[in-house]
Amino acid sequence: MTAALSLGWPAPAKLNLFLHINGRREDGYHELQTLFQFIEHCDFLDFKVTENTNLKLHSNMSTVVADNDNLILRAAKSLQEYSQCQQGAEIWLDKRLPMGGGLGGGSSDAATTLVALNSLWGLNIPIDELAKIGLKLGADVPVFINGFSAFAEGVGEQLQPVYPPQPWYLVVVPDVHVSTAEIFQDPALPRNTPKHSLTSLMESPWKNDCQELVAKHSPQVAKALAWLLEYAPSRMTGTGACVFGQFEQEQQAKDALAKLPTSMNGFVAKGANKSPLMLRLAQC
């Protein structure tokens, strides 16, 4: 009997509505406070369960990533090892999110793989345990697994649900790849922002502690920020390179997008406090 394809598992992008770096731990990781919100712009994954433990990935990406570095295959393998599952999967990735953009695409792909295969393999591993598996793959993976907008502390794994407004965003994608590792290793990165309560942070102006450093080193990011500020309050997400502006109405965001310089790319997407992945999981 041939297993059916399970289609259309979304791996949504996220925005860091603010990002504060509070210090550096002895293990090299950074303490931070950040506010994650999903947007309705996604990669998509399809899965076919196999009756052996083989894992195979197909992708529309032009750049080939080695299997041992690919977060999707690492996620599937981690789930197999954790559960002792004797099934495998053939996976198709429709990559739509930019790489190295601060939108969390790789982490989101890994999270969708864990959530989908947990369901398709019939493992029924609780979400909190699944998030622990995901944390070993990357600090941003748990928020995608939990599936709600969240205030995050620690290295990003301590999550508290929040429900900020869900506006429309214009996301500008500069033609540059920013290395998260290089930014966090840069001695010029601010690491002493005081910690504040969530209530205080929600009432204060939002900022990204990485933005000034990235803009200094990446003229493309600085140019995108300067252009977007003409139309809306704008910030960088994560360690960049993507920047976003907030709009009340979809048409306002689309009107700004229509004026985007030809040297830049961008898209319009709605904020979402519940991940599209959770809506897909509910269909199973």
From Swiss-Prot:
Metabolic or biological pathway, per its Swiss-Prot or TrEMBL entry:
Isoprenoid biosynthesis; isopentenyl diphosphate biosynthesis via DXP pathway; isopentenyl diphosphate from 1-deoxy-D-xylulose 5-phosphate: step 3/6
Which EC number(s) are documented for this chain? Answer: 2.7.1.148
Any one Gene Ontology molecular-function term assigned to this protein's record: ATP binding
Kindly indicate whether the keyword tRNA processing belongs to this entry: no
Q: Which Pfam families match?
A: GHMP_kinases_C, GHMP_kinases_N
Q: Which family does it belong to?
A: Belongs to the GHMP kinase family. IspE subfamily.
- This chain's protein is named 4-diphosphocytidyl-2-C-methyl-D-erythritol kinase
Q: Which organism is it from?
A: Shewanella piezotolerans (strain WP3 / JCM 13877)
Give the organism's phylogenetic lineage: Bacteria, Pseudomonadati, Pseudomonadota, Gammaproteobacteria, Alteromonadales
Q: Which gene encodes it?
A: ispE
